[in-house]
Amino acid sequence: MTEGTPPTSKATRLRLMEVAIELFKRHSVAGTSLQMISDELGLTKSAIYHHFRTRDELLDAILEPVLAEVSAIVEAAEAHRTVRARADHMLTGYAALAARNRDLISVLSGDPLVLELLNAKAEWRAIVVRQMRLFADVEPGVGGQIKAMILLSGFAGAARAEYSQFDGPLDEAAFRDQLIAAGRRTLGLRAPRPAD
């Protein structure tokens, strides 16, 4: 795209979603209006409506690819034979997703409107329930459920944190590895032995 060429519709849509996530971080989903997004982008509200008629439609577009990826991780994890192997696969896959999507994970985990939307869509709720079960099954009963909740809440909290105040910025690979290590400790999993 050369200077002066208007951005493509797809590029505008992606930029709109990026700005929405940033505003969701600052103001929550409920605290962010389409008007705020249009103001931030310098677009008219009608330009926003061209892509998304409502904030919920925008939120759907943001959530859909993430939940599709979580679903793929869940399905691959469920194919493993043992409870621990299933949990470890879910853990490593979700840690990689969280590391790639830190801003999004920090916003989407715990925002009341996001939770409401997840619960309203049966297929999305089912994905989250299956994910939780993969973590919780490591320790049957309420203890496993609590550990699963701590793990997911911890990932969201870690994604929100600003690490540069400590040792400098944390890159994606280092962040992923730290999430995996903390998750294994939380669930009582050992790292798989390296193949010879």
PLM regions: where:
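Helix-turn-helix
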Residues: 15, 19, 23-57, 61
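Solvent-exposed, amphipathic alpha-helical segments
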Residues: 19-26, 69-77, 154-162
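Hydrophobic alpha-helical connector segments
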Residues: 61, 72-106
